[in-house]
Amino acid sequence: MTQTLSQLENRGAFIERHIGPDAAQQQEMLNAVGAESLNALTGQIVPKDIQLATPPQVGEAATEYAALAELKAIAGRNKRFTSYIGMGYTAVQLPPVILRNMLENPGWYTAYTPYQPEVSQGRLEALLNFQQITLDLTGLDMASASLLDEATAAAEAMAMAKRVSKLKNANRFFVASDVHPQTLDVVRTRAETFGFDVIVDDAAKALDHQDVFGVLLQQVGTTGEIHDYGALISELKARKVIVSVAADFMALVLLTAPGKQGADIVFGSAQRFGVPMGYGGPHAAFFAAKDEFKRSMPGRIIGVSKDAAGNTALRMAMQTREQHIRREKANSNICTSQVLLANIASLYAVYHGPVGLKRIANRIHRLTDILAAGLQQKGLKLRHAHYFDTLCVEVADKAAVLARAEAAEINLRSDIHNAVGITLDETTTRENVAQLFNVLLGDSHGLNIETLDKDVALDSRSIQQSMLRDDAILTHPVFNRYHSETEMMRYMHSLERKDLALNQAMIPLGSCTMKLNAAAEMIPITWPEFAELHPFCPPEQAEGYHQMISQLSDWLVKLTGYDAVCMQPNSGAQGEYAGLLAIRHYHESRNEGHRDICLIPASAHGTNPASAHMAGMQVVVVACDKNGNIDLDDLRAKAEQHAANLSCIMVTYPSTHGVYEETIREVCEVVHQFGGQVYLDGANMNAQVGITSPGFIGADVSHLNLHKTFCIPHGGGGPGMGPIGVKAHLAPFVPGHSVVQIEGMLTRQGAVSAAPFGSASILPISWMYIRMMGAEGLKQASQVAILNANYIASRLKDAYPVLYTGRDGRVAHECILDIRPLKEETGISELDIAKRLIDYGFHAPTMSFPVAGTLMVEPTESEGKAELDRFIDAMLAIRAEIDQVKAGVWPLEDNPLVNAPHIQSELVAEWAHPYSREVAVFPAGVADKYWPTVKRLDDVYGDRNLFCSCVPISDYQ
């Protein structure tokens, strides 16, 4: 039969590229699990009362090429003015070697958070370098491996200051009046839920206020003034006040380290180390503190440890501080950092080295001096005598200056009374400075750049002598070796080879949704139309962004069944926080601000209680029954007991136990009956899209992990995006922004992120995914994710019991394998199996969550049958190895499992094990071998001997 033109056009071609198993393989797997079709399987598993009758109307699929052309046209509506707005965001020059070999390399951007250090040594080393940069520039003892953005870091600094303060009765936090406005915005949001009073005043008046536990200063103020806070910090320390200082990485190359002046905490944005502005993000924040406060720090910390052979190895240290263990007692709810962006900044510093960075910083400062000298020579007044890269220029006819700037396609900062702000950066040239003279003075100014340069080179006093850095930075060999592109390329490749990412194997992590991040989805993020926009540029310059965000928001509204979407949260955890704040403010608007009880099932991810605590709520745990479902009787009892103060429930659907709970609508009804709201955690949205939706189920608010369900890559531990969907009654209470009015949002609430649309430059990834999949493709993706999980469960259930199942013995999109009986019989643990999987070429599933002693497996729809079978065969082979231990063939203390993983050097080392080298490193005929570079990490040694800066190069060799 002749094919139709529509069939030949094959507009849904990408669906087959994204979904792993083809139609024939899907049928094979359906036969294996005993289902006739995908629809039949879905019908068996998903409760009938929540199944959508028709897929959400998000349009038909488009080809990769059509979608790219459509988005390119939208991006073309953005206007690429030269922005001198500053306020914590500047243009950058991302070295092409880093762009090509890292940002555009799936070996870097598809990796997961390095919870399995044996398969993560490359990015752990890059993150350790990031920590070393932070330590050198801030002058402090301990640094984390990045936070979400500078404003979030400021809020974390305030929370940490309260935790470590010895002034236990003090409840006030002082903020200098010249911090960036978006920083103050996020600090105020956090302070409100914690019950802190925020005082905003001139820094000189910090000592005038009583009952202050912490102070936030900004080394280079938002309008450019360099402050020497040494004396003030000393006086504050004498009063036992915790001092936090916001700083700028590039400025710190030349300026005195705040830690040397006595600061307790120093933080800021690493954006200008090679990360494009991207209309607000994603960017990595840096965070450092004194050693005595290390256990109260937020964020991940990379530490140097040893492996089982005594070799130097890296790992994430002090994880007991984090939300997945400490829950509501955690230092922060944030489980996403900004690894990919931190590593760009890290490699930027490695590539340029201390000499190159000083050259860049001095060039920026020289051009700023030249601009200042010329303006002053022509009679204009500068607000500040001391500056690094930013001038605050008083102008008589501000409107005329701004009009000339617009005509020249230049953005100046315009929100300063009777003045304009101008921030220069590493992209600024002498020609740009000449153009700025024309804008500020008119064309007939007669200034000469070369003459001005000679003058300022001989007599620059714009950085006060007391603030000039007098110590060396970045002296470690890693920052002084890789300065040719050849060396840099090879260094980055050597790091990449140490890690296991999706370009090598399936990453079957439960609750993480490690699906394909397609090349077509990634291409737009580096387009200059998206990458180069300042987040505070005039809205008419960002019409392309607004159209793309509006379309994506509309699609997400239809997919979730909600009425509105807020794009601001930078991670799922931040989305939880924003959603809970919306609930809190909704209750307050009804004069029910006393409602502060948050019900959370015992099975919940640790982020849930941590977020509830951060939103000022009290956690009450709801029991689960023997099948892992929410115990309805206990829920009713708790809801009724706390009816007067019930704020909400946080539930995950499908549940964290990997099943579709039959009573989810009843759960929603019970909570609503007693005046509460329903927060449905979107972590498992990949099993809902096109089949059901949170709004249809009965929830009021959810966050969506765009880095899970909607294809933003995990980046080795960030970036992420956690926009929230809300019903209409909560829409007025989503985050707003103090600098930018968010179109279509009536909210007057404070911000949770520095930028109005969070990490806007990665939203095109999700736009592309939805556009290329269309309604039918999205539904099919969810169905195949369910099929793949049930196929694995069906084939492994005789070797490893599946802990929880729903109707007909089915699971949702993931399954929990119970290792506890095996451990009781043989002594082999889930940890041993996880590490042995590395020898088979796999990343481990999720260990001991949500149930200790288990492995949770989520294959996603992107994995084909061949890869699923390879994983299943590996798990069955490992089960056979466990039986060998059980039978006494191999002793418990010396077998391939407890010694896993095995490294290449063991092949030529002395061999005294009761199993062969072949069994160790080529088990079950593994052909495409991944080689870990370290053996199993010694976690106890790492935490007892905390060391979080770069080690000698020889230790890596």
Swiss-Prot record:
EC category name: oxidoreductase
Enzyme Commission number, as recorded: 1.4.4.2
Gene Ontology biological process terms from the UniProt entry: glycine decarboxylation via glycine cleavage system
Modified residue annotations for N6-(pyridoxal phosphate)lysine: 708
Gene3D superfamilies: Aspartate Aminotransferase, domain 1, Type I PLP-dependent aspartate aminotransferase-like (Major domain)
Cofactor(s) for this UniProt protein: pyridoxal 5'-phosphate
Any one GO molecular function term: glycine dehydrogenase (decarboxylating) activity
Binding partners and assembly: The glycine cleavage system is composed of four proteins: P, T, L and H.
Identification of the protein by name: Glycine dehydrogenase (decarboxylating)
Annotated source species: Salmonella paratyphi B (strain ATCC BAA-1250 / SPB7)
Gene it is expressed from: gcvP
